[in-house]
Structure formats: C-alpha cells, structure tokens
Amino acid sequence: MPRCNRALAGLACAVCLAAQPKPEELPVFRSDTRLVVLHATVVDRSGNLVTTLAQKSFKVYENGVEQPIKVFKREDIPVAMGLIIDNSGSMRNKRLKVEAAALQLVKASNPDDEVFVVNFNDEAYLDQPFTGDIKLLEQSLAKIDSRGGTAMRDAVRMSIDYLKESAKKDKKVLLVVTDGNDNNSTGTLENLVKAAQQSEVLIYAIGLLNEEERREARRAKRELDAIAEASGGQSYYPKELAEVDKIATQVAHDIRSQYVIAYTPINQVLDGSFRQVRVMVNAPNKPVARTRSGYYATPDIAPKAARPKTAFR
C-alpha cells in the first residue's frame, strides 16, 4: 500500500454572491447553545449544483423529527483547508500531477483561505502549517519521499485535530489523495468517522486506485467513502490520472456553493447518543442535499481514543 504523504492544503469554500458585504462568522456548535451547523451541497438529478434556493425549500430532521432552522445563508466564506497527500512508493509517478491539481484547488479558492499540507506514508508529517502563501504550499507539496506503506487514517485524524487546535476559520475542509489501502494506521475507521462527524470537517477524497488489485481497491474505496459520506464531503475515483485537475476544480466549486444551515436541537439531552441528521429539499427537478450524516450529543465532542501526534519535519 502506498505510504501517505500528509499533504493537507487548504480548500476554499463558501458561495459567492456578487456585491455582498463581508461574510459574518459562522455559528459554532457548543454544549451551552447546542447549535448544530450544517454545510449542505445541493445538486439536481444530473449532478449540477443548485445555488439559488430560499430557506423555505429546506427542512432539517434530527432522528426523524423536524427541527426549526435558526440560521440560513449562502455566502463565500473563507475556509481552513488541509491537503493530505499520499507519499508512498506507488505514488512516485503520480505526485507531480497530484501536486498541480492541489495547487489549482487552492488558487480557485477564496483568497482569504488558510491552508496547510500533510504528506504521509508510514507516518504523517505536517510539512506546512497554515498559510496563505502559494509559494510555501508549492514547496511543501514538492517534499517527495515516495516510499513505504500507507497510514491514511492517522494522517486524516492528525489533520482533524490540527484543524480543531489551530484553525482561525469556522468552516473546515480536508482533501485526501491516495492510491491504496491503509496498511499502517493505528487508529480505526470507526473512530475516524466519529471524529469527522463531531468536528464539522468536510472531507473530500480522491482515490487513484489500482483496479488490478481488486481486494485492496475495494477496501480503500470503502474507507474513503465512509469518511467522505459521514462528513458531508464527496469521494472521487478517476479512471485516468489526467482527470485529477478537473476533480480539483469540481471540489472547489462544491465547497463554494454550499448552504449554511444551523438549528438548535429540540432534544437538548447530552446523553452521548448519535443523532442522525437529514436535510430535505422541496424544489423543482427534485434536487437533493448532501451534508454530514449526524453528530454525537455530548459536550466532549472528541472520541476518547489514541490519536496520532502532529509531526513536523
């Protein structure tokens, strides 16, 4: 399996409306206010983004019970973005194309975004802390040491923790690029999914999987799908390496075209249970909304599990 080169580079998100005032900060989920914030992407049956809907078109359900919407807006909100890049041996001939796509994503994002880079193989390394300097991001992405195995889950978990500790923006996004199944992480998929749901981080994944290794590819796809779907992001599996640029642009558009929806749960009990969340859309052509699948109702939003420490080099 490819060793993951931890390269998390910032994703720019939020939806731009012409001549709008500077966006306000997003509401934050806290145990006292119990405000749950959702970032929802809406697409029609052809997969095209739908960006002109009003609040009346949306309904939010928690465990099947409709919730009153407290905040609804669509703005180009700067994000805290991480690029997590596989740097295992099998990525050696793919890195240059992947790096170019990652930089294109950053350039297509909000200029006020903050971005960091994580490269990973057997271990994950924070090669560039938060920055808005495209040259520094380019240098960190170029730290190629393609060898060893793949610790994708640990790289993503480390990146989630880094976002929680260091991000100055409320909206948080990760892009993971890997070409193989995780074979070196200490953390489990279950705990990673929990962390993603609790952190409000949108996770996008690009899997450059080898179809000749079908069993390995299926395992890798299952993990990438799980973390992307749980967080409200999306996973992509290009058939050709040349498609990565197009996917990066698509991810940028997705992030910048999302609705911000927040509600105060009717059920205020902090019992640690999982609360399933669904956003339903009533509009012509039957569009559908994609957002995180739920959250855990506990003041301590971090699952109690061993976490990989942030490593610098």
Feature locations, PLM:
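Scaffold/interface architecture of coatomer-like assemblies
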Residues: 19-313
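Bacterial N-terminal signal peptides that target proteins for export
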Residues: 1-11
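Hydrophobic h-region of N-terminal signal peptides that target proteins for export
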Residues: 10-20
